[in-house]
């Protein structure tokens, strides 16, 4: 259940009973200090100011009308009008027992399910995926998982770069290599070197460059031979991306790919409609939409070119066509874009033009969720030692290799299990190190920090889960099916039970704000509270009464299930042991 929402509804009802207008919020939040209870409602002060009454007296009248019998052991007023709510241990135990028996652990949101399009990853198929693609791929995938978990219909869209002038050069190079007897899969086995070879060929061979430019025209006009070569290139490049997605445990599949080329037939119509509405006007031969809404400090409108002087289209045109498709064909209520912060103005422009042209209904939520950059120790964007782009595949391989060296310390593991654990730890460490940082900030990439089993890291959370699994193995019990009465007596038990129950609140917040680090911080706090509980409250010691032992096992099982579920929503796998 969502405790915060449950309590907020009760406090809001009491506020209404004492004559406070409904537009005043209870301002209910988790208390920052144990002495202030478990939750705190601060709405009386804002209401009292507007109503010109004493806030403490108003808070008292709210408390007098507040029905929390059987829920709170104590409700008290502190300071100028804070309402501190101390929850009953027995009530917490009942709620945890009920939530643990459900498949999802967390009550799904009561809001009506929406159709949500999530645009993420979207690599350029001309090149191999590099570290710059990591953040969009894993942050977007985390939100897609969470929104689905909350009951929304999620439509993933991998808006790959599969069109443009560079493809003339690449198709010409592929044709050359195929004429030498190579198969497409072999010729393109290393996309990076293939691209460099094609570029060098283009720069040094005038005849090749002429052919490449001709192939762009033939591609755009639908020449079947050129289209076949383009399809071969796309197929092999997408296969490279899918291998990365599989290794990253990302849910994107071939069915989610809808590249730039998918909108080619709609681009002329987009420009025509913008012209018909008087939004697009000719400027130096190009078609431009001038947005006064995004004017600069001098008052000059922001120009959005939708068609070049030579008749060609731009990213803005394609993105407008994609928006029309997503709100029309896909019937999206909400569209989330996970694109880095450098594209913020572009996304603002596209959203503004789409609204003005009525390409999207007014109720559709258009959201650009930007993110910062992965930095090296030198404070510059993460590169190889030679200053080149780091291939994502090589980064992930190194993560698994480094993790295997850590896992090798456990001599009880056979080779296959050790390799599986190393993969989960290495990939999980990379993903968690990224997801646990505030999305909008840059962060410094550090191997030692991310692979540590101490602190707010992926390996630490995976270890916390295996620690609980080992308790059940030692007790010769099945964690998933174990059942017993849950009783809460110790402070550490209450803190752990309360934190476990707050999972639903956290997931709902992440779904709304698209900030995965909030879930990461929650899981770290939960793991830390479990370690504190484990030290203070013995479970399997011989002098522990059976009912206490079983109760603590039930509590531990709830924590393990919550950890596994939370990590799964982050796209991180758990293991039986480490």
From Swiss-Prot:
GO terms for biological process: arginyl-tRNA aminoacylation. Pfam families: Arg_tRNA_synt_N (PF03485), DALR_1 (PF05746), tRNA-synt_1d (PF00750). Keywords: Aminoacyl-tRNA synthetase, ATP-binding, Cytoplasm, Ligase, Nucleotide-binding, Protein biosynthesis. The keyword Mitochondrion does not apply. One of its GO terms (cellular component) is cytoplasm. It is found in: Cytoplasm. Belongs to the class-I aminoacyl-tRNA synthetase family. PANTHER family: ARGININE--TRNA LIGASE, CYTOPLASMIC, ARGINYL-TRNA SYNTHETASE. This is Arginine--tRNA ligase. It comes from Teredinibacter turnerae (strain ATCC 39867 / T7901). The gene is argS.
